[in-house]
Structure formats: C-alpha cells, structure tokens
Amino acid sequence: MSGGVYGGDEVGALVFDIGSYTVRAGYAGEDCPKVDFPTAIGMVVERDDGSTLMEIDGDKGKQGGPTYYIATNALRVPRENMEAISPLKNGMVEDWDSFQAILDHTYKMHVKSEASLHPVLMSEAPWNTRAKREKLTELMFEHYNIPAFFLCKTAVLTAFANGRSTGLILDSGATHTTAIPVHDGYVLQQGIVKSPLAGDFITMQCRELFQEMNIELVPPYMIASKEAVREGSPANWKRKEKLPQVTRSWHNYMCNCVIQDFQASVLQVSDSTYDEQVAAQMPTVHYEFPNGYNCDFGAERLKIPEGLFDPSNVKGLSGNTMLGVSHVVTTSVGMCDIDIRPGLYGSVIVAGGNTLIQSFTDRLNRELSQKTPPSMRLKLIANNTTVERRFSSWIGGSILASLGTFQQMWISKQEYEEGGKQCVERKCP
C-alpha cells in the first residue's frame, strides 16, 4: 500500500517554493502562502575566541557553527561581521547548511508543529541535478522525519496554477528568465531556454543609472533623520551615530532593497522598440529616495527595462549573444516537436516577480504576435494580480497536494526506507 493513508486536506500537507529571491511556504489547499520572506539570510561566524555578539533573534546553527538571521526583521538589523548570503545558486541548493536554517526557521516560527506530522511538497528548478534531488529527499526524511515527500518542477506547478497541463511557461524571476515547455504535466527538457536577463540584471542597470545621475544610494539603516527638500535639491539628512562595522555584502543587500522598491514603483516597459522621441513624451514618475532626495524620472524609466526585450543596446554585455524575452519564447517552442507547438503557443503562461514591471505583458504580447507563425493561434495567459504571478508555483503546489487523485503519488516514509533516496528519480518526474 503506497502512501494511501494521506488524504489531502486532512493531513495539512506543507508546500515549499524556495526561489532565488523569496521563500514561500504554507499549507496545501490554501489560496496563498502563509509566509513569504527573503531567501537571502544573514550569517555571523563565531569569532576566534568563541564569543559571539548577543543572541536575540538569531537561529543558532550547528554547535560552534555560524549564527543565521532569517526573514526581513532579523536580516535588516545592522550587525558587525554579518554577511548576507544566499543558499541557492542558479535556482538550485548550493549551501545546504543555510538552506537547512531556512527550513528550521519556517518550521519553528510558522508551522509551529512537529515536522513529522506534515507531508511536504517542494518545488524545484527544472534543471535540478539528480544528486541534489537525492540529497534533498534524504534531508527531508532523515533530518525532519516527514511522513511523505514529493518534488515537482516549478514550471509544471505554474501550469497547474493556471488550470493547464500543457503550455509554455515564461518565468522571469530574480536570477534568470526561462521558457519551459510543459506537455501533459511533464517538462520537455530539450526545449528549456534560459537567459540571465532578469530582475537582478535590472537592479544592476538601475545602479548604473544612479551613478550616472550622481544619486547617492543611502539605505534606511544609516539614516537618523531627514528634512524635506525641494525636487532635485541635494538631500539633507543626518547619519546615525553608532553604526556597527557592517560587511560589504550586507550593505549591498540593503542598497538592493532600495533599488528594488524603485524598480517596482518607477520602471515601465515601452510599448514598442525604445525610441528617444517617444520616451521623452511619456509622463514622468516622481520618486523619493530614503534620504529625502527626490526627482522625476522620464525616459530613463523606459530605457532600463528595454534590455529585457532588446539586449543589443545594453552596454557592458559582452559579445551580446543574449536573447530578449520574446526570442526566449520562440526559440523554446522551435526546439519542441512540431505537433505540440500549437498547444504551446496557445497557452504562453507568464510568471515570476520580474514580469510585474508595468506593460511587460503588453510588450511581450505585441512581439510574440509578430513572431507567431500565421497557422497558429497565440494566447498569452498572465494573471493581473501580483500575488498570483509571484506565487504561481506555490499556488500550483497547493492545488496539486490537496487533490484526492494525487494522494497515491507521495513518496511515503515506508517507500523511502525500502528503496532509499533513489526512489525520487522514479516517483517524481
């Protein structure tokens, strides 16, 4: 009898969707995750004499190991020697200790009940390696002692969240933009196309813009007080007196938080290929930085996201063979079997936080309509709400784990004990 014991809703399966930018976790069957906190975590390594700073809200790692500061409130407090690190690289787990710290934190602070009571469905990158999948399976069963486990590709979950089992998922997150063809609930590996032009790339472009405009980036943690100043006038603010010696990685993280707010508030994708004249006619957007400096942004707000669609005019991209967003989609479809292409063009599903830049989907729709073969019907599926687009793979996981028909799919503890960690390759496509 394979895992038939678990009925979806009664057990309260947990769904984890851990991305490069945020961690989303919650109970299956609910419509949005219970928690959503940054994947970046603060890490303080003990000093040589074995003393650490006062522990208040840190999660102690292994004995004598580093102390981790997780979730926004703990991470954004300036501390001496605290590095901001990310457990993921290229969408896959790289640093297992800090990854485990994130899971510990979620269980302790948010689930607040024994890990052994809840089956876990976890999302994974479509290019995750066999070794990492097996290691994760082993961690969940051996360390957390969970009753059942399942790993599912993010793209498949996004398709399910949109009520489809076939479609082309265009996922643009923090570290990369990918087009992933899904057919009948399976990822077609040969059709995956990845581009590094995504949210972090836009953050870098914004940083360069601020340098050109001589705008000083001051994260809020440095500011004691500020005065209102007129538009374009130099900022008038006072620095906090007693600031600890922070690390460069952490200061950088705090600066990026400011830039990401700017990205979400100001940037917009131009309707058609960027044109100086047209951009100059667009309405400007007023933005105030944390230190009180404020000004209007005009053409710049269209110019920065242009790199996503037309990488050719971005300076500093070497040899520039990168693909714009719409090229990523058409290239991916072109690598799939000719018979399934209509099904892919017929549901291009847009997901990921980076696609929330204003007018992103309009521009994508426009470019794809020009590139789609006349014999095929193009349909772009993009949720209007930020929640559904940012959490799409979590929502798909929530739907999947609470389906009655899914309950026989879990890898049960018993199966794991009999077949070892290799069973993940067999049971989770």
Swiss-Prot record:
Chief localization: nucleus
Residue numbers of N-acetylserine PTMs: S2
Entry's transmembrane regions: none
Keyword Zinc: no
Cellular component annotations (GO), alphabetically ordered: npBAF complex; NuA4 histone acetyltransferase complex
Modified residues (Phosphoserine): S86, S233
Cellular location(s): Nucleus
Protein name, entry field: Actin-like protein 6A
Provenance organism: Macaca fascicularis
